[in-house]
Each structure stands twice: as C-alpha cells, then as structure tokens.
A protein has these predicted regions:
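Clamp-loader machinery-focused feature within the broader ASCE/P-loop NTPase space
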Residues: 2-159
Length: 162
C-alpha cells in the first residue's frame, strides 16, 4: 500500500482490482463523494496498483517496487495530479509561478503524511485551461507501453475555459 493511514473502501477496491485482474479497465473512473472520504487517496492508490510491478494478492500495490516508490513520493512520470491553481500570469504560458510550485510541493508533502489532506493552493477557485493544455502535451509525448497513464483531476467541476 502507498498510504498506510488510508482506510480502504473494500467494496470499491474489490471492483477496481477485479477490473484490473480481468483486463477490463475502462478508460475513466469517477471517484465522487463528500470531502474527507479519501477519494483522491483511493485514486492515487489505484494508480499505484495499475503500475505496480509486484502486486500483492492480486489486489494491492506492493509499495516497494520502483513504480510504487515513485507514486509514494507523488513523482511518477505517468501519474498526473490536476487541481485548482492560480492561472499563469501569461495566458499563453502554462508554467506556474515559483511560489505556487512551492505551495504545491508543500501540499504534496502533507498529502503523503495524511491521505485525507485536501490539496489547496492559495485561494484558487478554478483549474485553468493552461493546465489541461500542458497535460495534453505531456500525455501525447510521454506514452509508455509498460505503464498506465493516469490523470487524477481533483475538483473537476472547477475546470474552466480561460
């Protein structure tokens, strides 16, 4: 397991692991529910399971292989976390301000310590279109035959067109 403190929803996890074991993984999942239930952590845990090289009991990521260690640090090259951020200062540029990047890293560290931590960057209320455009480029150029590409969009209702 990636998150030691995550209390798995076993009904949901059985369905997810069954889909993987039966080679019937759909192209998208929606993890919905009230805040504080671990939706985002379950999605991260599932992304680790998809990419794990030594799955335990056909149900859980090992937490120790190279892929799991990358997920454990929220630094896997095929797993993308998208969440509300301030828009870039230049609309044609998808790069974030250094202060925003530092705040993201601080939130990621808190997430690793507490899987129920809500990633919140300042008073961001939207997911800028520049984030999605940047993601599309990364996905287009980074496809690997060995790993699953996973995009986790937190607060997807906050996607915007500007």
């Amino acid at each position: 397991m990636i998150f030691d403190k995550l209390i798995l929803n076993h009904n949901v996890w059985e369905k997810l692991s069954s889909a993987v074991n039966n080679n019937k993984v759909p192209n998208a999942f929606i993890f919905s529910g009230i805040d504080g239930t671990g939706k985002e952590a379950h999605a991260i845990e599932f992304s680790a399971f998809l990419n794990c090289k030594r799955v335990v009991e056909k149900k859980y990521p090992c937490g120790d292989c190279r892929s799991c260690l990358k997920v454990r640090s929220l630094n896997h090259e095929e797993i993308y976390l998208i969440h509300p951020t301030p828009p870039p200062k230049n609309k044609s540029d998808s790069n974030l301000d250094q202060k925003v990047i530092e705040e993201i890293y601080k939130n990621y560290k808190q997430k690793l310590l507490n899987p129920y931590h809500k990633i919140k960057i300042g008073n961001s209320k939207t997911i800028p279109i520049a984030s999605i455009r940047g993601l599309k480029k990364k996905l287009f150029f980074s496809k690997s035959d060995e790993n699953w590409s996973v995009v986790i969009i937190s607060d997807a209702e906050k996607l915007c067109t500007q």
